[in-house]
């Protein structure tokens, strides 16, 4: 719906010719040189087949047949696990609800026609306008996520124990998938998501969260029985690791294994000469939040996760 005095707006998937300008619009907050570098890198990734820009949607003034003013852009990337990762729209006017609505409508239509299984969008809690737009178009709020970060200068001592671990490779893939599924049982971390997404799909999604580090994906064991696992990814530009998943099987919970696994991940990140380890946790998962806080993780930001299933 257009506000009084606002021009009508139309939205559509960006054509190949429109993509450079739309990407530049998305990075409009950056200095010109950095902006052009980001656009060039994304276009190069698409050319190499590492990224698809088919989910790039634009919104223009509707009363101009050609060359209308660009009012917003929104990018969605379809992952191999079937998750369409939607990045919040960038608007020329932060209060341009009509453009936000058209961008989400165009994105949703693209998603419904794609091979995606679910669409996910993370937005900051201060973004009330787009939160309302998401709800109005059938997206459900999944959880409040707390994003946390810890530097690696001073770490707790890495305790020696009988716990062993194996890393991810083709021969251990099935065991990783099985153990991942077992850690979902009675989990407090986004249980609605784990109940509908298969462990196989989830593992594939974690691989795409950044630079894949199979040698640092660890499955922990005690006397031959699997305890749980930690999965990390590297964000090279930022010089840090992200703990994309940590999970413990039910019969090993409450025995300090999550702490042991987490401390080892911190030490591994420091050995890799990273500056920090980051993670995101469901705010409702109070035991996990306390564990991270006690280990020195500090809250950076909170975001709301919204989902939509394929219809």
Positions of PLM-derived features:
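Acyl-donor-binding surface of acyltransferase catalytic domains
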Residues: 1-4, 80, 92-163, 169, ...
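A short beta-loop-alpha structural element at the N-terminal edge
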Residues: 4-24, 164-178, 185-187
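Active-site rim helix/loop that mediates acceptor-substrate recognition in acyltransferases
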Residues: 26-62, 193-226, 231
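Conserved active-site alpha-helix within GNAT-family acetyltransferase domains
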Residues: 105, 125-143, 259, 283-301, ...
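Conserved hydrophobic beta-strand within the GNAT/NAT acetyltransferase core sheet
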Residues: 119-123, 243, 277-281
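Residue-level recognition of the GNAT/N-acetyltransferase active site
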Residues: 87, 91-93, 124, 249, ...
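Conserved acetyl-CoA-binding loop-helix of GNAT-fold acetyltransferases
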Residues: 95-109, 248, 254-271, 289-294
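Conserved donor-binding loop and adjoining core beta-sheet/short helix segment
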Residues: 40-105, 109-112, 230-240
